[in-house]
């Protein structure tokens, strides 16, 4: 392959090299006076941007992108995480690197399948492989609250002696309805039952980002003392540094990105004196 072609393609794909958010895996196949692209890209916007860059770099070349597979096309379909916690893996295997752990109710866009694994996009743009059996086609119940404790147990009846239906982790969205005997009925993508309302927080909390919410984040942070470090973890079973920061903000009603470098890029400088939260 001509070195000039390889360089042009590499430069055209360079802006889409972060595999956490992009797919741009292309090769050039010469034929019939044209330069044919094959491979896969995440979406039409990626393919369009690559084609523009190639045409600018090699204006006399005739390009054909008809064989490129666009993942976010008509075949993509929405699904929902239907277990309390699952992995977003770099490869279609539990033995590969874990990138994150979506909770019950997380929206998933399935882009392609490989046996019992699917390559998926989360609603925050992260990409990875997920175990197909832990997803379902039905959307999660429309949430009104999120789990505010490190974890809660959901019971089949409104008492602590009833069978446990499931365990839900901090930050999991749930739909809450009035229950009985001081309990509330909760519905999630991982199951429904009864829970203690003191362990839930409304999603429509309109309190300003003031000292009260900073104090809440400080209080929540202390609840995770002793939790083991787990690369890609997001729960009391194991959590990493950026997942911990994201979860504490989520519990305080603030959405921030998943990974530390993206969190840093999205932040702003603050000046001393620094305060907890």
Regions found by a protein language model. Give the residues of each.
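...with weaker cross-activation on analogous glycine-rich loops/strands in unrelated enzymes
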Residues: 254-277
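N-terminal targeting leaders
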Residues: 1-95, 99-101, 106, 132-137, ...
């Amino acid at each position: 392959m001509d070195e000039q072609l390889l360089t042009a393609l590499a430069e055209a794909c360079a802006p889409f090299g972060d595999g956490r958010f992009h797919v741009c895996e292309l090769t050039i196949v010469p034929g019939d006076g044209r330069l044919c692209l094959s491979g896969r890209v995440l979406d039409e916007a990626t393919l369009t941007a690559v084609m523009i860059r190639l045409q600018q770099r090699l204006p006399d070349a005739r390009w054909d992108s008809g064989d490129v597979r666009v993942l976010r096309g008509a075949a993509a379909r929405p699904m929902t995480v239907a277990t309390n916690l699952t992995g977003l893996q770099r490869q279609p295997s539990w033995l590969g690197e874990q990138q994150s752990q979506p909770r019950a109710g997380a929206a998933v866009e399935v882009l392609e399948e490989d046996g019992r694994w699917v390559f998926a996009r989360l609603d925050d743009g992260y990409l990875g492989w997920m175990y197909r059996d832990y997803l379902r086609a039905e959307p999660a119940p429309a949430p009104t609250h999120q789990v505010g404790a490190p974890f809660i147990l959901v019971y089949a009846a409104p008492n602590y002696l009833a069978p446990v239906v499931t365990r839900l982790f901090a930050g999991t969205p749930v739909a809450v309805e009035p229950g009985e005997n001081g309990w509330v009925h909760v519905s999630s993508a991982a199951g429904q039952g009864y829970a203690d309302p003191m362990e839930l927080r409304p999603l429509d909390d309109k309190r300003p980002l003031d000292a009260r919410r900073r104090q809440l984040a400080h209080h929540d942070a202390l609840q995770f003392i002793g939790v083991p470090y787990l690369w890609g973890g997001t729960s009391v079973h194991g959590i990493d540094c950026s997942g911990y920061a994201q979860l504490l903000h989520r519990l305080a009603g603030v959405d921030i990105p998943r990974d530390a470098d993206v969190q840093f890029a999205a932040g702003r400088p603050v000046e001393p004196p620094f305060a907890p939260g």
